[in-house]
A protein has these predicted regions:
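Conserved helicase motor core of SF1/SF2 NTP-dependent helicases
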Residues: 2-13, 22-36, 42-161, 165-215
């Protein structure tokens, strides 16, 4: 898994010396983080370069290969550089064959929080819990369930779809057509951990369809 050089030490110093209480302070402190990545494999480096040069990137790989960490690290770095207005996090919330949030208590964010822990854990390691909380509270980092994307055009956003192996072909098609002006998409998943049949996986279908396509 990829790690930022001296990542824990750098974040601990920034976090302890400069507590923040608002979005402006949080974003200002992001600029002071040393954004250096130590790639652990050529595949990780290739993934990073692909994100850098394309508006939409698909990545399939096993758990622990660093795809989620690299995705959120890149997104947070771009946010620190003010390249995008905000970060959108999404997953297909598969439960017994479909997205069923209605029976869970709380609002949408509370319902989806257990599904988004992989995002939050990695982001906390990079920018600290306090800054993450402020950026979430101000919708600078926002969670939108994949099923709720229909009809939304996402402009000036950095969007990460994880666990995409559980999205159907129709959901992936709907998702990629939501991209607006000056936005970047990363779509990741593990085809060996799909909760739906592999031939129905939108990620599997998209990788086959878009193999060799750049842009």
């Amino acid at each position: 898994m990829a790690r930022a050089k001296s990542r824990v030490k750098t974040i601990t110093q920034v976090k302890s010396e400069q507590p923040c209480s608002n979005k402006r302070q949080a974003l200002s402190q992001l600029k002071r983080i040393k954004w250096n990545i130590d790639f652990r494999s050529e595949n990780q480096h290739h993934f990073w370069k692909t994100i850098d040069t394309n508006d939409i990137t698909f990545c399939a790989g096993p758990a622990g290969c660093g795809k989620t960490f690299l995705s959120v690290y890149y997104a947070l770095q771009m946010l620190a550089q003010k390249k995008y207005e905000s970060i959108i996090l999404t997953k297909p919330l598969v439960e017994a064959g479909g997205e069923k949030l209605g029976f869970l208590p709380g609002d949408v964010e509370e319902k989806t929080a257990p599904f988004m822990m992989s995002f939050y854990y990695n982001m906390e390691q990079i920018i600290g819990k306090q800054r993450l909380g402020i950026l979430k509270d101000t919708n600078t980092i926002q969670v939108i369930p994949l099923a709720f994307m229909r009809g939304i055009t996402l402009s000036n956003k950095f969007v990460i779809l994880d666990e995409a192996q559980n999205a159907t072909t129709e959901q992936i098609k709907m998702f990629v057509t939501r991209i607006g002006e000056h936005s970047k998409y990363i779509i990741t998943g593990d085809l060996d951990q799909s909760d739906i049949q592999k031939h129905k996986s939108g990620l599997n279908d998209a990788i086959k369809r878009f193999a060799g396509v750049h842009g």
